[in-house]
Curated annotation (Swiss-Prot):
GO biological process: angiogenesis; positive regulation of angiogenesis; positive regulation of endothelial cell migration; positive regulation of endothelial cell proliferation; protein insertion into ER membrane by stop-transfer membrane-anchor sequence; tail-anchored membrane protein insertion into ER membrane
Topology in membrane: Single-pass type I membrane protein
Gene expressing this chain: Emc10
Signal peptide segment: 1-25
Matching Pfam families: ECM10
Name this protein carries in UniProt: ER membrane protein complex subunit 10
Length: 258
């Protein structure tokens, strides 16, 4: 009996250990897996850890056409609401093309997919984009600020880009100042819209009605309130005007007899 009880105890301990192993593996798998493999540009690995990636693309072409190419990735940590960026260096050909576009007052465009964690345009539900004059980006030495606007469902609804200090003054820029982007990124969560003041209006209306019910005198018209003052004044005017009218009539008759 003692041996059987010891065997049952060992079996229970073994089962508890086996049950505890998967939970620890699941808790550490997100951290270890992400650290070992890194966060891919498609965001699928990061999505399981609460972080999604958005492919950041840019285009700078002479003319109205756009040819978007990868600039980097925006990493959105949905758990703590932070946003960071990883970006690649511009090649010599890209730096020259950016200068050419700036010389003709062309545009520099950026875009991200509407749905985080997707690459293909059809799966991403389209893109949101923004632009600045290419000359202002060149003269800012590639210093810009990206602001990502998202909704409550986690979709991207807007993207804005601002360069510092901004403006096109024709300043000379060294080629080495156009190699790396100096970017700050900000996440703009959905704001709480002010609700209608229906409840306050109804409450104020009920208070006014209750006040009128307590003071019914306030609901009377002007004449109903002050009739006792108006009638004596009218009677006084009528009585004071009657003798004057009689006197004027008598005087007129005497004049006609002559």
């Amino acid at each position: 009996m003692v041996a059987a009880g010891a065997g049952v105890t060992q079996l229970l301990v073994l089962l508890l250990m086996v049950a505890a192993v998967p939970s620890r593996a699941r808790g550490s798998g997100c951290r270890v897996g992400a650290a070992a493999r890194g966060v891919g540009a498609d965001g699928h690995e990061a999505e399981g850890c609460g972080t999604v990636a958005l492919l950041l693309e840019h285009s700078f072409e002479i003319g109205d056409g756009a040819n978007f190419q990868k600039r980097g990735s925006l990493l959105w940590n949905q758990q703590d609401g932070t946003l960071s960026a990883t970006q690649r260096q511009l090649s010599e050909e890209e730096r020259g093309r950016l200068r050419d576009v700036a010389a003709v007052n062309g545009l520099y465009r950026v875009r991200v997919p509407r749905r985080p964690g997707t690459l293909d345009g059809s799966e991403a539900g389209g893109h949101v984009s923004s632009f600045v004059p290419a000359c202002s980006l060149v003269e800012s030495h590639l210093s810009d600020q990206l602001t990502l606007h998202v909704d409550v469902a986690g979709n991207v609804v807007g993207l804005s880009v601002v360069v510092y200090p901004g403006g096109c003054r024709g300043s000379e820029v060294e080629d080495e100042d156009l190699e790396l982007f100096n970017t700050s990124v900000h996440l703009r969560p959905p704001g709480t819209a002010p609700g209608p003041e229906t409840a306050a209006f109804i409450e104020r209306l009920e208070m006014e009605q209750a006040q009128k019910a307590k003071n019914p005198q306030e609901q009377k018209s002007f004449f109903a309130k002050y009739w006792m003052y108006i009638i004596p004044v009218v009677l006084f005017l009528m009585m004071s005007g009657a003798p004057d009218a009689g006197g004027q009539g008598g005087g007129g008759g005497g004049g006609s007899s002559r």
